[in-house]
Design a protein with these regions (language model features):
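Transmembrane helical segments that form the transport core of multi-pass membrane transport proteins
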Residues: 65-68, 72-73, 99-100, 252-356
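Helix-loop-helix module between adjacent transmembrane segments
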Residues: 90-96, 116-117, 128-140, 172-181, ...
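Juxtamembrane and boundary regions of transmembrane helices in multi-pass small-molecule transporters
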Residues: 2, 6-33, 164, 168, ...
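Transmembrane alpha-helix boundary signature
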Residues: 59-74, 89-108, 131-143, 310-318
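Hydrophobic transmembrane alpha-helices that form the pore/transport pathway of multi-pass ion
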Residues: 120-176, 190, 346-364, 386-409, ...
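Flexible interhelical linker loops that connect adjacent transmembrane helices
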Residues: 36-38, 224-248, 284-292
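Interfacial loop-to-helix junctions that mark the boundaries of transmembrane helices
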Residues: 1-8, 40-47, 68-83, 199-209, ...
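Hydrophobic mid-bilayer segments of alpha-helices in multi-pass membrane transport proteins
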Residues: 8-26, 46-64, 78-91, 144, ...
Length: 419
């Protein structure tokens, strides 16, 4: 493990950025107390800003310590396809026609179940939607599930305890629910092509296990809070979802499918996105405000993580090489909590000669730990951004999120490791 000054300083900056993500509530408190600099403290309290801010610090260091050419070459050498993809797919999937389509699906399935409708809606939102993420991508599923939870439950004054328990299950289920296909989950997307993982492989190795875990997590949470859920006044919105014509919904779904199909080709999916913006403008009466700001913040978060993560290979790769498959599974869960799981699996894919058992352990560990922190899984900032306004002082406690994600993570461990 040979490290030069750039490696060491970059890792120090990365550690500071991670600590910053756990301190955003402190900055929000300062913002509420400050009269003259509340805007600045609010900025530092935005978890989506953290990695972009410290990526700027790293860039300034590279410029000062090396030179302009070195800093620019480093930035241009990184791959920003995933941040751009997440931004685009978030905006499209959160558009009103697609949201109405998925909401209508949830309502229909919930109504078909022979139980209280509010309870079944809660259960289906936390089970079906995360599994749907295997087909519409995890960022899209996170956006839809978070919007549904906010509208149907978080905005109805549920307890803080239920809020944290729900977001803990949501983050874990989204992370593991996208493993039925090789393109939906960012940590799998990073390795599927190189390791030749196709749809069949994903179903056989990951899909059935993740389905069991997702359903168990959603079921246990629903049973735990069923009394509180039943007290929520649930409004039937099945007619609301039919406002947009089927043709408009179909075109939105085609745009989403096109973006997913060309997920590796930035020029194409950005072009499709521009056409999508034009279409929503032409048929504005069927649209609501697009989720541009929130999506940009999430994309900025991920881009900053890419810049900072690119300098962590010097310690992460030798660490992975020193572990056996059993240790790497639990090690990946732990490392995922402090690093993006897609970055972790990508670095693992750079190591040659890995056994199939090692590959499974690395990816399974990465998705298992994807709900423990906001930075653990690429779609998490999307859910955080949508739901944080419902929490006290507009911030989500990283510690309480971590604690509430542990039970669901343990269920995922049982399914991925022992089934």
């Amino acid at each position: 493990m040979n490290a030069d000054a750039v490696n060491i300083v970059s890792t120090v900056i990365f550690v500071i950025a991670v600590l910053h993500t756990f301190s955003t509530k402190y900055f929000e408190d300062l913002a509420n107390k400050s009269n003259h600099h509340s805007g600045f403290w609010h900025l530092l309290g935005e978890v989506e800003i953290v990695f972009g801010l410290w990526a700027l610090v790293l860039t300034c260091f590279l410029y000062a310590y090396k030179d302009k050419s070195f800093a620019v070459q480093y930035l241009e050498a990184q791959n920003y396809t995933e941040p751009a993809f997440v931004f685009v797919v978030m905006v499209i999937s959160a558009s009103k026609p697609i949201f109405d389509f998925c909401l209508n699906m949830v309502i229909r399935i919930s109504s078909a179940l022979p139980f209280d409708k509010t309870v079944t809606t809660f259960f289906v939102t936390l089970s079906l939607v995360p599994l749907l993420g295997s087909f519409i991508t995890e960022p899209a599923a996170m956006t839809l599930a978070a919007l549904m939870l906010k509208k149907n439950f978080y905005d109805k004054g549920i307890s803080s305890k239920m809020m944290y328990a729900t977001i803990g299950v949501l983050f874990v289920n989204i992370s593991i629910g996208g493993t039925l296909t090789p393109y939906a989950a960012p940590p799998i997307l990073m390795v599927a092509a190189k390791w030749n993982w196709d749809f069949i492989h994903m179903i056989q190795s990951f899909g059935w296990r993740s389905t069991i875990a997702v359903i168990l997590n959603a079921l246990m949470l629903t049973l735990l809070f069923r009394s509180e859920i039943k007290q929520i006044k649930f409004q039937d919105e099945s007619t609301h979802s039919q406002i947009a014509p089927q043709s408009v919904i179909g075109i939105h779904l085609l745009f989403l499918a096109g973006v997913v199909f060309f997920a590796h080709h930035t020029v194409i999916f950005v072009g499709l996105f521009l056409f999508f913006i034009g279409f929503t403008t032409a048929y504005g009466k069927y649209q609501s405000k697009l989720l541009i700001r929130e999506s940009l913040l999430v994309g900025f978060f991920l881009a900053g993580l890419v810049v900072l993560g690119g300098q962590q290979k010097w310690w992460l790769e030798p660490l992975l090489k020193s572990l056996n498959p059993d240790v790497v599974y639990y090690g990946a869960i732990a490392l995922t909590a402090i690093t993006d799981n897609a970055a972790l699996t990508y670095l693992g894919s750079l190591v040659e000669g890995l056994s199939e058992e090692f590959k499974y352990a690395l990816v399974a560990g990465a998705v298992t730990g994807g709900g423990l922190t906001v930075i653990a899984n690429a779609p998490n900032p999307a859910g955080y951004s949508i739901l944080k306004g419902s929490f006290k002082e507009g911030a989500i406690s990283p510690l309480l999120l971590f604690i509430n994600a542990i039970p669901s993570t343990l269920i995922a461990i049982i399914c991925f490791k022992f089934l």
